[in-house]
Every structure is written in C-alpha cells, then in structure tokens.
Amino acid sequence: MARVQFKQRESTDAIFVHCSATKPSQNVGVREIRQWHKEQGWLDVGYHFIIKRDGTVEAGRDEMAVGSHAKGYNHNSIGVCLVGGIDDKGKFDANFTPAQMQSLRSLLVTLLAKYEGAVLRAHHEVAPKACPSFDLKRWWEKNELVTSDRG
C-alpha cells in the first residue's frame, strides 16, 4: 500500500503526549489506530509514535510530516500516543505499564534533544479532553504516575 504524502513541518516547537483511551485489555498498536483514524475520515494515523502496552515504540505518521493529533498545533508539533488510559468502566485511568513509561521517557529525551527548544505538553493543555489521563508535568519532573483528567 502506498503511503500518503503529507506536508512537512517547518519547525517542531512542541511534543504532545496522548493516550488512545483504550482499556488495559486492548493491546492495540499503530495498525489498529490507523484503521480507527481512517474510519473517522482521516488519511492516515494522526500520531507520529505509538507506545504499546509492552513498551514497544511503533512509528506512525512520518516524523517530519504534519500530524493530526492536536488541533491548531499539528503544523509545529509531534504526537506521541500511549496505548491505554481508561479502565474497564471507561473512566480515565493512568493504567500504563512500567515498560510504556520507560519507553515514553526514553523517546521524549531523544525527541527533546533532537528538537532543541521544543516543549513537552499534554493534549488536555490545548483541548477540552482528559488525554493523556495523567499529570504529565508531575510524571516528568518527579516520576510519579498519577491519574488526572486535566493534568
């Protein structure tokens, strides 16, 4: 299957962390999320990276392509999605695995070094959503994973 050619970002000013809003039992990856996004009418997966439950980091949309993950910010940001984020009843929950969080930290360190001056942001900072279901700043600074619907 030929990949869609997207406009390239001119700058990378932010790295957004998202969750897939899936239950812990749903071990999905880029293939499934791509399909969900296409079912919504998108041309491809909106995120640049997806981190599966086992900590595997999968490439989504080309890293330099404009993403589709944070309205109004896609032109100058990268989107990273953690699989999970809700419990079996559909409530927001920081149910991410230690392997996921280790992979997230490693990926973010790499991206922040690569894109000097980029800032780390949670999706809920720019949209009325609970995504990514945890307090990103607290986790980044103190390594404490705490469920949060607003950060």
From Swiss-Prot:
Zn(2+) binds at H18, H123, C131. CDD domains: PGRP. Residues 10-132 form the N-acetylmuramoyl-L-alanine amidase domain. Its cofactor is Zn(2+). It is found in: Host cytoplasm. The record marks K129 as: Important for catalytic activity. Its EC number is 3.5.1.28. GO terms for molecular function: N-acetylmuramoyl-L-alanine amidase activity; zinc ion binding. It is an enzyme of class 3 (hydrolase). The record marks Y47 as: Essential for amidase activity and zinc hydrate coordination. Keywords: Antimicrobial, Bacteriolytic enzyme, Cytolysis, Host cell lysis by virus, Host cytoplasm, Hydrolase, Late protein, Metal-binding, Viral release from host cell, Zinc. One of its GO terms (biological process) is defense response to bacterium. SUPFAM superfamilies: N-acetylmuramoyl-L-alanine amidase-like. Its main location: host cell. HAMAP family: ENDOLYSIN_T7. Belongs to the N-acetylmuramoyl-L-alanine amidase 2 family. This is Endolysin.
